[in-house]
């Protein structure tokens, strides 16, 4: 009867009997619980590309080094000599060690090495503030320019142009921004590789750099983040790079000329002052020393002579007469007393 009932089409009445006759294998009892399968440090919600990108980000120091370091590979940079014309979009000053460029304009920078770096080496660009009171802050674009940008890296100041292999990073500890591009060997007949950088915010933007000077650090690194070379230069993003470069170089020359003139025109120490102070320390010697005074005009000479004769007479008569003559306390009091007596 039970077998006949089971052959009938399934319905709510036959489901209970079917469930009770299901054979459960004892082998399933030895399997681990479902929770055990998820406790093996596996995150199924993590994007594999994101995991790989985070893995390649080296731990950045709190304060990046800004000293130039050529390293074993002779890492160096070369800038185009664009001059100081008003029409240039970027120009580099060797005197100042400073790059002047326009907003969002491409700036070519040559990368030179004496010895080829390891396979997979990258060039990393990072921006930091120059002054010590601002070096702890992250260099970002101003809110105005960020709002006009729809890209994923809209807050990054430095962009790499002309390469689809550029990667943008944000350090998880310091929050500093950086961008990397793979190092490419120089083409045949060339000694250097050129990378194209653009700066996406003006130096004067409120809420961004806010007229605070910045430094750009270019490092040659391995895939593990080991620094093979480092170069640093100051950057000013402005509307007229040629004009600003010419102005700052002129100010540098003027300040250097002023310092030279000050050193040349420094007055020599006055020896007469030293002699006077030395002689003033010995009052008794001054009274006995004889001085010669040149006087213009006979009448004036006779007046000074009579004055001198009177003083000589006082010295001969003794100190008693000097004590009888009271010394005036001050000139103002004498005048005031005279007016009262009148």
Curated annotation (Swiss-Prot):
- Chain intervals for the UniProt region annotation (Disordered): 244-287, 318-342
Cofactor binding mode, per the note?
Binds 1 zinc ion per subunit.
Protein keywords: Activator, Apoptosis, Cell cycle, Cytoplasm, DNA-binding, Metal-binding, Nucleus, Phosphoprotein, Transcription, Transcription regulation, Tumor suppressor, Zinc
Where along the chain is composition biased (Basic and acidic residues)?
Answer: 244-256
Q: Which family does it belong to?
A: Belongs to the p53 family.
Which residues lie within the region annotated Basic (repression of DNA-binding)?
Answer: 319-336
What does this gene product do? Answer: Multifunctional transcription factor that induces cell cycle arrest, DNA repair or apoptosis upon binding to its target DNA sequence. Acts as a tumor suppressor in many tumor types; induces growth arrest or apoptosis depending on the physiological circumstances and cell type. Negatively regulates cell division by controlling expression of a set of genes required for this process. One of the activated genes is an inhibitor of cyclin-dependent kinases. Apoptosis induction seems to be mediated either by stimulation of BAX and FAS antigen expression, or by repression of Bcl-2 expression.
Q: Could you tell me which PANTHER family the record lists for this protein? A: CELLULAR TUMOR ANTIGEN P53
Q: Where is the composition biased (Low complexity)?
A: 271-282
Q: Where does Zn(2+) bind?
A: 142, 145, 201, 205
Provide the residue ranges listed under DNA-binding region in this record: 68-255
The segments labelled Oligomerization in the record are: 288-317
Give the CC-aspect GO terms: cytoplasm; mitochondrion; nucleus
Name of encoding gene:
tp53
Residue numbers spanned by region Interaction with DNA: 236-243
Q: How does it assemble?
A: Binds DNA as a homotetramer.
What the entry lists under InterPro entries is as follows: p53-like_TF_DNA-bd_sf, p53/RUNT-type_TF_DNA-bd_sf, p53_DNA-bd, p53_tetramer_sf, p53_tetrameristn, p53_transactivation_domain, p53_tumour_suppressor
Q: Which GO BP terms apply? A: apoptotic process; DNA damage response; positive regulation of transcription by RNA polymerase II; protein tetramerization
* Pfam family for this entry, one: P53_TAD
For the site labelled Interaction with DNA, the residues are: 86
Q: Where in the cell is it found?
A: Cytoplasm; Nucleus
Cofactor(s) this protein cannot do without: Zn(2+)
Position of sequence motif Bipartite nuclear localization signal: 261-278
Q: A GO molecular-function term, please?
A: RNA polymerase II cis-regulatory region sequence-specific DNA binding
Q: What is this protein called?
A: Cellular tumor antigen p53
Instruction: Give the highest taxon in the source lineage.
Output: Eukaryota
